[in-house]
Amino acid sequence: EIQPDFISVTYGAGGTTNNNKTFKIAETIKGKYGIESVVHLTSIGLTKTDVLEKLHYLEGVGIKNILALRGDIPEGYDGSGDFKHASDLINFIHENGNFNIIGACYPEGHIECESKIKDIHNLKKKVDAGAKQLITQLFFNNDDFYSFREKCHLADINVPIEAGIMPVTNTKQINRMATLC
């Protein structure tokens, strides 16, 4: 019998801002099946009040694991919201709840970052802000993952780093993920 440590429940891609389904699915996974869930929480366009409401809800249903992300920038985004970077959201969650905060990392580099060195610097900000572990976003080359972990160690990023796994069902899915990550 498969007994995963957790099931990750995505928030949506492409700038989706409604996470009610995410929270309900995570609640069902934990309540009905007894499997820990990790909810994705993206900060794009959210205020501190919005996030506090979400944190209180998650605490109330016993969900302790949050993958804190900036999220995809939606078309027409006006720059609103209190969180410009994932590290800002991580810090806020850390200061306002008792959660296992997970940060995203990018072994092949974040698509918007101009260098892998700056990418590692940004990752260090996430850990310093309160991320207790990291999970990778899409990568294709295992050597990049191993090299990335070594660079993290050298940068004094000493939290667990897990390779994110997503079942691939078609080529279109791979191409879409490659443009988002």
Residue spans for each PLM region:
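Active-site mouth loops of central-metabolism enzymes
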Residues: 1, 37-49, 102-118
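Glycine-rich, proline-tolerant flexible connector loops at the mouths of alpha/beta enzymes
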Residues: 2-25, 71-81, 132-147, 151
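Hydrophobic faces of well-ordered beta-strands that scaffold small-molecule active sites
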Residues: 5-9, 37-41, 66-68, 101-105, ...
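Alpha-helix-loop-beta-strand connector modules within alpha/beta enzyme cores
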Residues: 16-40, 83-104, 146-165
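Glycine-rich anion/phosphate-binding loops
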Residues: 43-57, 80-84
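Non-catalytic positions within long, well-ordered alpha-helices that form the structural scaffold/packing
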Residues: 59, 127-128, 153
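Catalytic-face loop-and-helix region of soluble metabolic enzyme cores
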Residues: 164-181
